[in-house]
Amino acid sequence: MSDYKVNEATIAKKAELVDVYAQKMTEAASIVVADSRGLSVDQDTQLRKQLREAGVEFKVVKNSVLRRAAEKAGLEGLSEAFSGPSAVAFSNEDVVAPAKVLADFAKDAENLEIKAGVIEGKVSSKEEIQAIASLPSRDGLLSMLLSVLQAPVRNVALAVKAVAEKEESAA
């Protein structure tokens, strides 16, 4: 017989962690799982700063906790990404932000590898996450929409101004 005893307090803490991360996964607009092994302390600090500025939460969590949390959140397909060291980036606001920051950072830091992710509740592959990263941010998309909506009004204003100037010069 083994003298190993199960520590009830440790099990309770892990169950609580699973609940916390399952809730984060359920509420998140997007999640990106990455392997940040091999980043220097300076690179890791820079990455965390950029993610924080973008409103993204970045955590390194045990794979067993993440796997159970993903199952509890109904994201079973994400469990395959939890092998080797895993860091998870959560965003509740901007769907593109975690993918964009991590993909941009990975261009300079070869040791950062995106594994998979979740976009609005759908498990996505590494390739899909990188495609999302190439999209403009929410603010960028809104500014593009605004300029498209303003164009007809601007054209009408210019046409009215041209007619007014033509009539003034004719008079």
UniProtKB/Swiss-Prot annotation:
Keywords tagged on the record: Ribonucleoprotein, Ribosomal protein, RNA-binding, rRNA-binding
Record GO cellular component, one term: large ribosomal subunit
Top-level taxon: Bacteria
Listed GO biological process terms: translation
One example GO MF annotation: structural constituent of ribosome
Record function comment: Forms part of the ribosomal stalk, playing a central role in the interaction of the ribosome with GTP-bound translation factors.
Subunit text: Part of the ribosomal stalk of the 50S ribosomal subunit. The N-terminus interacts with L11 and the large rRNA to form the base of the stalk. The C-terminus forms an elongated spine to which L12 dimers bind in a sequential fashion forming a multimeric L10(L12)X complex.
Alphabetized PANTHER family for the sequence: 39S RIBOSOMAL PROTEIN L10, MITOCHONDRIAL
Family classification: Belongs to the universal ribosomal protein uL10 family.
Protein's name according to its UniProt entry: Large ribosomal subunit protein uL10
